[in-house]
Amino acid sequence: MAGTGTIRDSVQLSLGTHRINPQPGPMTVHVDSYRFLDIVTRQMVKAWIAKEPSRDIPWAELQKPVRDCSVAVISSGAVALKSDTPFDQETERKNPWWSDPTHRVIPRDARGEDVEFYQLHIDASFAREDLNCLLPLALLAGLEEGGEIGRLAAHHYSFMGYTLDPTFLIEETTPKIIEGLRNDEVDLVLLVPT
């Protein structure tokens, strides 16, 4: 079933200034998602969003209860096993408009001491204290143990967010992640943006 919104609607909802009126009446909550951005960055982001083509958001109804689903995580936090190839920070330092468009596979039993964080656009100190901030594997394992989810998938995925040119990410990385999710028979994916 196709979604009724568009990607542009979604981006504008998540980044734009909008009003929320949860109940009829005089109380209105104003949400300004740009409030922490300087004026130049704010204008740049708004111009970038305006240039994005409007596309339908694909939507798939869940076919079974969550308690019967296999669940995986995809994080844009650039999380990688210490034993794996690091994300390319050096090229990004030289060209801040570029980010490594590849991905890393993280096993379900990974712990904080097993991984490193390569995202240059966030303070990863909180994730070093608690991996669940960027890759909530322990939390999901607890839900699995409690019968809230069917099972935690064997493999999870991370890529480096802030990808201004998503061509490689869409054409090369995403199909590989989808193949891995299908191989693990994943029913539900938790997307963890940074």
Tell what function each PLM region has:
Residues 5-8, 13-194:
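An N-terminal assembly and electron-transfer interface module characteristic of large anaerobic redox
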